[in-house]
C-alpha cells in the first residue's frame, strides 16, 4: 500500500519563475514561504512541528520586523508538538498572523488564538473546537497515577494559555473546555479566540498621483 503522505507530496504543484539566471522551479509551499506564508495542515505531531518551527525561525532571520502569516487547517494532535510551535511563535520577533481555513480543533485552536492581537482571523465556514487534553495510559497503578497528575497539570497550563489570549476568566475557560466545544467563526470571535471573520481580502489602496 502506498504511503499517503508520499502520494500527496507527489501531487504538490511546481511553480516556475523567470530569473536573471533563467527559469527556477519551486514547489508551491516553498514559493509561498518566500511570501512569508506557512501552513499548518493535518495532525499536529513532532515532524510537522519541527518543520513549522524551522520555517518560523528562518523567516525571523530573513526579516525580524516583517509579519508572518500562518494558515491553519488542523484537527489538533500531540500537545507537546503544538506547544513547541506555540513557544516558537511567542519567542520570535516578527508578529505572527493566524488564519483558520477549514478547521482549527484542539491544539489547532490554541495555535489559532496564539496569533498576534488583532491579527487572528477565520473564514466564514471555518470550524473551531476547544477541549481539555486527553490521554490513555496503562501499566502499574503508581505510574497511571503519575500520568494522571501530569495531565491535570497540563490541563491547567493549557487553560492559562487560553485565558491569556482570549481575555476570559480561568473559570469560564475551564467550563468551556470541559467537553468538546464546537464553534462557528462568529462564535469564536465572540469568545475571543479570533479577532475577525474575513471572507475576502481587503482591496489594495489606490495609489495617489
UniProtKB/Swiss-Prot annotation:
Task: Please state what the protein is called.
Answer: ATP-dependent Clp protease proteolytic subunit 2
Q: Which InterPro entries match?
A: ClpP (IPR001907), ClpP/crotonase-like_dom_sf (IPR029045), ClpP/TepA (IPR023562), ClpP_His_AS (IPR033135), ClpP_Ser_AS (IPR018215)
Compartment(s) where it occurs, according to its Swiss-Prot or TrEMBL record? Cytoplasm
**Cellular component terms (Gene Ontology):** cytoplasm; endopeptidase Clp complex
| Reaction catalysed by this enzyme | Hydrolysis of proteins to small peptides in the presence of ATP and magnesium. alpha-casein is the usual test substrate. In the absence of ATP, only oligopeptides shorter than five residues are hydrolyzed (such as succinyl-Leu-Tyr-|-NHMec, and Leu-Tyr-Leu-|-Tyr-Trp, in which cleavage of the -Tyr-|-Leu- and -Tyr-|-Trp bonds also occurs)
Class in the EC hierarchy, top level: hydrolase
Originating species: Mesorhizobium japonicum (strain LMG 29417 / CECT 9101 / MAFF 303099)
* Function description: Cleaves peptides in various proteins in a process that requires ATP hydrolysis. Has a chymotrypsin-like activity. Plays a major role in the degradation of misfolded proteins.
Superkingdom of the organism of origin: Bacteria
Report the coiled-coil segments: none
Identify the keywords attached in UniProt to this record, alphabetized: Cytoplasm, Hydrolase, Protease, Serine protease
Decide whether keyword Hydrolase is in the record.
yes
Tell me which EC number(s) this protein carries. Answer: 3.4.21.92
Q: Which Pfam families match?
A: CLP_protease (PF00574)
* UniProt main location, coarse: cytoplasm
**Family annotation (PROSITE patterns):** CLP_PROTEASE_HIS, CLP_PROTEASE_SER
Q: Which Gene3D superfamilies match?
A: 2-enoyl-CoA Hydratase, Chain A, domain 1
- NCBIfam families found in the cross-reference section: clpP, PRK00277.1, PRK12553.1
Q: How does it assemble?
A: Fourteen ClpP subunits assemble into 2 heptameric rings which stack back to back to give a disk-like structure with a central cavity, resembling the structure of eukaryotic proteasomes.
GO BP annotations of the record are: protein quality control for misfolded or incompletely synthesized proteins
The positions flagged as active site in the entry are 106 (nucleophile), 131
Family membership: Belongs to the peptidase S14 family.
| Example of a GO MF term | ATP-dependent peptidase activity
